[in-house]
Design a protein with these regions (language model features):
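S-adenosyl-L-methionine-dependent methyltransferase catalytic core, i.e., the SAM/SAH-binding region
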Residues: 1-261
Length: 261
């Protein structure tokens, strides 16, 4: 079936996702991280018998999704909720396929919300802008110990303590770019020929802290079996070893217990 020409960002691994979910056979699917809508659209285009319930904690993502919802009609239902609230937010049980893409959406990186190093304005970093503390408030007010813990748990590693100290010394910060530049100019750790920005993992750790990404992921994985049935296909796209370890361990526990999916 040919793809409908609606302007959405083409997500990574879209062909692999369609194959893993066997979306061409049709069925009821749950996209737990709607984002820019690329995976949802691909599932719906894979078969006229495919239906999707798509969740996202980001209100802007749900608003953007109205174009797809208008086009696909009753085949697409949008739900504004974090995937950790799966059991409360989605009443349907027995999905044929469940998808979670744990990466940032292109739209989020372009919206000037502090997810990008280049953002000049106030940096927020909250997926749900109506709850919790912004990254700017956390970075500018948190005790050094709390900053260190967030960085260490977020994957910064042995440099977490010194980076936390530098942040406290150089704050307040008014933009994501200012913070990224301070980290870059600090020359922490060994010199590297890598093209990866020195602040990449720091920003990852702050985003994980602000959005409680590990807690959200663990609650979501606990809810997946109750939304599944025998034969449900489950696909998760992870972007760092912390996520990967949590997902892998949970899937092994399902296998050992003989539970779904």
């Amino acid at each position: 079936m040919s793809s409908t020409k609606i302007g959405v960002h083409i997500p990574i691994m879209v062909d692999e996702v369609i194959d893993a979910l066997q979306a061409k056979k049709g069925g009821m699917f749950l996209d737990c991280t709607f984002g820019s809508g690329g995976h949802t659209k691909a599932i719906l285009d894979a078969s006229p018998d495919a239906w999707v319930i798509a969740m996202d904690r980001d209100a802007r993502a749900i608003q953007r999704g109205s174009i797809l919802a208008n086009h696909y009609g009753e085949r697409l239902e949008l739900v504004h909720a974090p995937f950790a609230d799966l059991e409360q937010a989605v009443s349907f049980k027995g999905f044929d396929g469940i998808l979670a893409d744990l990466g940032m959406s292109t739209d989020q990186l372009k919206e000037g919300r502090g997810f990008s190093f280049a953002d000049e304005g106030a940096f927020d970093m909250r997926m749900d802008e109506g709850s919790g503390v912004s990254a700017q408030e956390f970075v500018n007010t948190a005790p050094e110990r709390d900053l260190y813990v967030a960085l260490a748990e977020g994957g910064v590693g042995q440099n977490a303590r010194i980076i936390a100290k530098i942040i406290v010394e150089k704050r307040p910060f008014e933009s994501a770019r200012q913070l990224a530049d301070v980290i870059k100019n600090a020359h922490v750790g060994k010199k590297s020929e890598s093209r990866v920005h020195p602040a990449t993992v720091v920003f990852q750790a702050l985003r994980m802290k602000i959005n409680d990404e590990i807690g959200q992921l663990e609650h979501f994985l606990q809810a997946v079996p109750n939304a599944s049935k025998k034969g449900t296909r489950f696909a998760v796209i992870t972007f760092h070893s912390i996520e990967d370890k949590i997902v892998t361990n949970r899937m092994r526990s399902w296998e050992s217990a003989g539970s779904y999916p």
